[in-house]
From Swiss-Prot:
Gene3D superfamilies: Nucleic acid-binding proteins. Homodimer. Interacts with PriA and DnaT. Component of the replication restart primosome. Primosome assembly occurs via a 'hand-off' mechanism. PriA binds to replication forks, subsequently PriB then DnaT bind; DnaT then displaces ssDNA to generate the helicase loading substrate. Involved in the restart of stalled replication forks, which reloads the replicative helicase on sites other than the origin of replication; the PriA-PriB pathway is the major replication restart pathway. During primosome assembly it facilitates complex formation between PriA and DnaT on DNA; stabilizes PriA on DNA. Stimulates the DNA unwinding activity of PriA helicase. Belongs to the PriB family. One of its GO terms (cellular component) is primosome complex. This is Replication restart protein PriB. Residues 1-101 form the SSB domain. GO terms for molecular function: single-stranded DNA binding.
Length: 101
């Protein structure tokens, strides 16, 4: 197995919850990250948005708190997801979520 682990903190910009046809609870949030990092000795602004998917009963307790404006830190793995129109995007599948606010 190869390493696939990402830790990212940011602010939720939108959130939705639904159950799959198999009855699995899912919460999907858009996470916006802003920071500054040094690269090659220069300080640069860093910005990204990524969709985060929380699946299963273990997230039921925290899912109700995941609304726009809430700051979280997520640890999980990234996976390629293809939309209905054929667009590819990276999605972060959460394995651990921590509320920061």
């Amino acid at each position: 197995m190869t390493t696939n682990n990402l830790v990212l903190a940011g602010t939720i910009t939108r959130s939705r919850q639904f159950d799959s046809p198999a009855g699995i609870a899912h919460t999907v949030v858009m996470l916006e990250h802003k920071s500054q990092r040094y690269e090659a000795g220069m300080l640069r602004n860093v910005y990204c948005q990524i969709q985060v998917v929380l699946s299963g009963e273990r997230f039921n307790g925290v899912a109700k708190n995941l609304t726009a404006g809430v700051e979280i830190q997520v640890e999980g793995f990234i996976n390629l997801q293809q939309s209905r129109n054929g667009q590819n995007r990276l999605v972060l599948h959460a394995e651990n979520v921590e509320l920061k606010t």
